[in-house]
Structure formats: C-alpha cells, structure tokens
C-alpha cells in the first residue's frame, strides 16, 4: 500500500511521518488488498494562532470502487491522524455491504 503525505502550512517531522505510516498500515491492514493507495493531507488551518486547527485529510483509493475521504480536525496532528485512521477503518469495514459486485 502506497502512502503519500502532503502538507500545507505544517511541518512534517520524521517522527510524525513514521507515526502516520505505522498508524495507517495498522488500521488499514485488514483491507490492504483492496487499497491502491492513500493520500494524507496535513494542514494547519489557523497557522501560528493555535487552537483546534490541525487537519488530517485521508483519501483512500480503492480497487474498483470509488475513493473514500475522511477528515478530522484536532489540536494535534497525531490525534487527528489517529481519529482519521479509525474512521477510515470503520468506513472500509462497512463498505462491502453497500458496494455492488464488480466483474
């Protein structure tokens, strides 16, 4: 599974990159064979003003199905990424029930 991380007005440290990759690999491991790739977007909405403004946007590209997009905003990128990964995992678990069969 390919994971691409993009930032906007946010600093991507090596620790944060490693945390994101490990967290997503763990959360999405069960559905890994259906995933073409994941694009992670990190942005600091208010810049240096502070507050709950760290956004993590996930776009999960699936084989033969439409993409899944999940977005979380928290005070910290680690927390936002954890919540987004959990939501993506739950969404993927529900997805086969609603998807039509693809030849």
Question: What kind of region is each of these model predictions?
Answer:
Residues 1-103:
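N-terminal, polar/charged subdomain of small-to-medium soluble alpha/beta proteins
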